């Protein structure tokens, strides 16, 4: 958790793209330069407690992939879509601008991370249930396999 982000990690265009966005009074550029321990104090209580207890190995693995993609982005290359099952990972400022495919139980849903998503869970953006659009046969799980003549 004591990893520092260097100022070289942040491209020059980064602050210009999301100038008007602020999280708890800090711009995205300031959040990117901030040490992770300082950023944790800005989060709501549930997320703060979760991060203070330490990250499980699967979350650390996801962060390694995010940092690898961020390095590719700095070099001017398009980073690959990062696939993960970690629905309970909290979105951190270093994830902004990347595309993460989150598993919803059936398939991977691509989520483009925006600054407004900071502090939320990845699973909030990959719905596990389909919304019902009609009330006929097949609308509910119990009527999915009713023969249609």
From Swiss-Prot:
Q: Could you tell me which cysteines form disulfide bridges?
A: none
Report keywords, A-Z: Ribonucleoprotein, Ribosomal protein, RNA-binding, rRNA-binding
Instruction: Show the InterPro entries listed in the entry.
Output: Ribosomal_uS19, Ribosomal_uS19_CS, Ribosomal_uS19_euk/arc, Ribosomal_uS19_SF
GO cellular component terms, semicolon-separated: cytosolic small ribosomal subunit
Q: Which PROSITE patterns match?
A: RIBOSOMAL_S19
Q: Which residues form a coiled coil?
A: none
User: Which named protein is this?
Assistant: Small ribosomal subunit protein uS19
- This chain is encoded by the gene named rps19
């Amino acid at each position: 958790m004591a990893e520092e982000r260097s100022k070289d990690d942040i491209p020059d265009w980064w602050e210009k793209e999301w100038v008007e966005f602020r999280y708890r009074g800090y711009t995205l550029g300031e959040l990117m330069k901030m040490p992770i321990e300082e950023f944790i104090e800005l989060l709501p209580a549930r997320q703060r407690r979760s991060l203070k207890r330490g990250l499980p190995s699967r979350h650390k693995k996801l962060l390694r992939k995010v940092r690898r993609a961020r390095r590719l982005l700095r070099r001017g290359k398009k980073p690959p879509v990062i696939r993960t099952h970690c629905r309970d990972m909290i979105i951190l400022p270093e994830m902004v601008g990347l595309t993460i495919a989150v598993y919803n139980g059936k398939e991977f849903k691509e989520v483009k991370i925006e600054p407004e998503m900071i502090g939320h869970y990845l699973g909030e953006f990959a719905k596990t249930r389909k919304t019902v659009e009609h009330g006929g046969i097949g609308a509910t799980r119990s009527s999915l396999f009713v023969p249609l003549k």
